[in-house]
Amino acid sequence: MPDMQIAIAGKKSETKNYTAYVEKCGFTPLVTLNTGDIAHCQGLILPGGGDITPAFFGEKNHGSKNIDTELDILQLQSFDYCLRNRIPVLGICKGIQLINVGLGGSIYQHFPSAERHCCLSGDQYHNTTIQKDSFLYPLYGSHMPVNSAHHQALKELGSGLKAIQWCPEDSCIEALGHESLPLIGVQWHPERLDENRAKTSGEALFSYFASLVQAYA
């Protein structure tokens, strides 16, 4: 395989787990928020982080915190570039929310059952249900424990997006696909999934994304 790069649209101090998985999949990671750099990459990861500026989905702030508007702008610009150029995108935690907002969707600024999903002394774990005809089903089967560290959640879905994984207790959307574009997103954190608690690994998801990147390169 020729040298291929996957961009990670975040800060170097917060993306070490992501770069490790990108390297494990045989790609060169490039942590950048510059669309000029992303133009030379074959894939994009939108990583976890704080909450998205509510104005970007048409709302005032009524529960969002740890907002970095400048970062949001750069991440959404990175996503838009990939969208227009059909470059595969993987969104993780905040990243899935960026995908949704970037396609016109909205966010619960504080999910009604956030106590089930938010970070306490560490990630919480809960079961999920996976849609049978989705890309996740061959990787993880019909049910899968996932790790949660979020208090927000997807609300109205953006154009072309489809939910493929849910928390059965409260219908929180845990993963997305797109009807025609190479866009995938998960609300959980595959880069730090505890194999002892989840009984599986996040590596399968990263390997799937790697195959998507190769297919579109």
What do these predicted regions represent?
Residues 148:
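DNA-recognition element of transcription regulators
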Residues 1-94, 100-102, 108, 112-124, ...:
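N-terminal beta1-alpha1 cap of cysteine-dependent amidohydrolase-like domains
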Residues 181-185:
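Catalytic histidine neighborhood in serine/cysteine hydrolases
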